[in-house]
């Protein structure tokens, strides 16, 4: 079913309530790449049960999704669920840094 969203529970993928280092970020990133391979479905990242996140995790898990060489964010949109404002602020910062980093590289 092409219009069905893919939901990923972050806590299950990294097997922890603390999304805290780059290797856990890698795990989530790889999973996103895996589930979106060959389709154009939207991915929902559910942060339910995650107590802590840091930038190392977010850079690797989500920042790299803005690298057009490895991921097409226009084709596979990514939505975030169950994330409090503190974590969202960190995420926004991560995304704006990633967008800058990857767009600078292209030009």
Give the location of each predicted region:
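Amphipathic alpha-helical interaction surfaces in cytosolic regulatory modules
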Residues: 10-43, 47-99
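Flexible, glycine-/charge-rich segments associated with ATP-binding catalytic modules
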Residues: 1-9
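Extended, charge-rich low-complexity interaction segments
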Residues: 103-107
